[in-house]
Amino acid sequence: MRCLGLMSGTSADGVDAVLADFRGSPNHPQWELIRHVHSPYPEGLRHRVVSAGQGETGCAEQWLDLAEAITEAQAKAARSCDPHGEAVLVGCHGQTVWHRPPTSQQRGASWQLLQAPLLAQLLERPVVHD
């Protein structure tokens, strides 16, 4: 089964995409890397993501617009890595905007932006997300 994974972290430099082929049992899977691509964010989008992570405030509409722009960039990276649509599903957690490591007083948490249903629609395949 071919699967596509998308990753974008707090560096906000773009999307890393990997197409891999998985075989074998779920307990002992074997996998093979088929292709990987780094798709840089356009400078304007990178600036918006970094600003959001540094605490820039905005209204709900601006956050939704940013999530949609990130989703479109994720779709572009996916198409670049899997131009023939070989993957049967896509795994994507979205763009990490803020990551809080755990401390003795507070649990760790991350905040990601993604419109997963939109990504599934754009790629015409299921998207696994959190």
Give the location of each predicted region.
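Short acidic/glycine-rich loops and adjacent helix/strand connectors
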Residues: 1-130
